[in-house]
From Swiss-Prot:
<dbReference type="InterPro" id="IPR005758">
    <property type="entry name" value="UDP-N-AcMur_Ala_ligase_MurC"/>
</dbReference>
<keyword id="KW-0963">Cytoplasm</keyword>
<keyword id="KW-0436">Ligase</keyword>
<dbReference type="InterPro" id="IPR036615">
    <property type="entry name" value="Mur_ligase_C_dom_sf"/>
</dbReference>
<dbReference type="GO" id="GO:0009252">
    <property type="term" value="P:peptidoglycan biosynthetic process"/>
</dbReference>
<dbReference type="GO" id="GO:0008763">
    <property type="term" value="F:UDP-N-acetylmuramate-L-alanine ligase activity"/>
</dbReference>
<dbReference type="Pfam" id="PF01225">
    <property type="entry name" value="Mur_ligase"/>
</dbReference>
<keyword id="KW-0067">ATP-binding</keyword>
<dbReference type="InterPro" id="IPR036565">
    <property type="entry name" value="Mur-like_cat_sf"/>
</dbReference>
<keyword id="KW-0547">Nucleotide-binding</keyword>
<dbReference type="GO" id="GO:0071555">
    <property type="term" value="P:cell wall organization"/>
</dbReference>
<comment type="pathway">
    <text>Cell wall biogenesis; peptidoglycan biosynthesis.</text>
</comment>
<dbReference type="Pfam" id="PF08245">
    <property type="entry name" value="Mur_ligase_M"/>
</dbReference>
<dbReference type="GO" id="GO:0005737">
    <property type="term" value="C:cytoplasm"/>
</dbReference>
<dbReference type="InterPro" id="IPR013221">
    <property type="entry name" value="Mur_ligase_cen"/>
</dbReference>
<dbReference type="GO" id="GO:0008360">
    <property type="term" value="P:regulation of cell shape"/>
</dbReference>
<feature type="binding site">
    <location>
        <begin position="124"/>
        <end position="130"/>
    </location>
    <ligand>
        <name>ATP</name>
    </ligand>
</feature>
Amino acid sequence: MIAPDKVHYHVPEMRRIKNIHFVGIGGAGMGGIAEVLLNEGYQVSGSDRQANGMTDRLSGLGATIFFGHQASNVEKANVVVVSSAIDPTNPEVNAANEMRIPVIRRAEMLAELMRFRHGIAIAGTHGKTTTTSLIATIFAQAELDPTFVIGGLLNSAGTNARLGSSQYLIAEADESDASFVHLQPMVSVVTNIEPDHMETYQGDFQKMQDTYIDFLHNLPFYGLAVLCIDDPVITQLLPRIKRKYLTYGYSEVADVRATHVKHTFNQSEFTLKRKDHQDIQVVVNAPGKHNVLNALAAIAVATDENIEDAAITAALANFSGIGRRFEMLGEFATGEGDVLLVDDYGHHPTEVEATIAVARNNWPDRRLVMAYQPHRYSRTRDLYEDFVRVLSQVDVLLLLDVYSAGEEKIEGADSKSLCRSMRQRGQLEPIYVADKNELPKLLADNLKDQDILLTQGAGNIGQIAKELQEMKLDKGALRTGWSK
């Protein structure tokens, strides 16, 4: 459990700033920063299109929440914080500009929170949320009481953000809009680098890599980079990094290394090897090869901070997971047999493939049924062939329409096209779900006894999973349709 220090670490207040307004406050990243600022004593308001768990939580903590975007929402603000999803023509942004109220991106506010703290920033295409959560859990186990801002719900804390009493701030660094270059942490972690959010980088993967170098060079000369040497792109970039770094991975040349890895049901166990340390056995209460790498990153950071091995191993063994990261929502008697419902946020082919691998390892003899919702037309276009290959690995695929996240439709980068390409590949016959309201009936027609139903994606598929959980996957209820 998190135990506060006797003396709270004092962070200077932002001069002239009392009222902070967030446009798009319902997102995990935005809402997390808003929660920390509320707990620091600032007046916080925010707007979003509709209520969700985040807006409900912030409202309960004292934030003023508006639904819908209008100019009057920012009248009392001293600064307006916007997410990357907010259109520059948003009426609240326009009003703030007219009133000469500073409009800043989320990462700029996070950078301000980090400026007077010992910042630990976690970047990478995959694994940011889990790695950030593991680091926060280890620091809490060591009674260092960190502040953290995470892109998912940390189950042990019941929140994705918390104001701690120590100097430590542990946060995800968002590469999706390149805003992570605003951060100036003491420790930077990079888990991997793959093409994603390529519209931010004008479709130039080299430009993305250069931006990661800029992010790492924001470290002070006495800072530390923690890098996954198993990632081929990171390995190629090592000669360009002009800061001290530690490497981690399965590779024999890694500074922090896992050997003798065993994967059991929902856990991983390995021998930890570090230079100038005795080998120890580690159990991570999270499944899959990818989570061993995430744990190694967390161990590297903790070791650099001189956290004792006992705290590290206890935290990893008792890690209670994150919302929507291979989250088991229950096994239900559907009327014709038992079906296990698992929900996962992964929306990049590498992430989806890792999720499938964990499901196959956990339940090798059970059929895998996936309801997948692609996220963004641009990602579907850029990674099209990888999606076709990976999604063909399940036994039954129900493919929902692309969750646009505000993007215009791109010809040939939609779910119908994916279905056509998978049929041509010949491994399975995907089921196209033209209307999400048809999903329950299609599930009722296709689920069998002992199936694993995996709801996958970063759009509103998570809410769909919760509704399926409420229906307990009962075939009669599924045929009736959504309860709301």
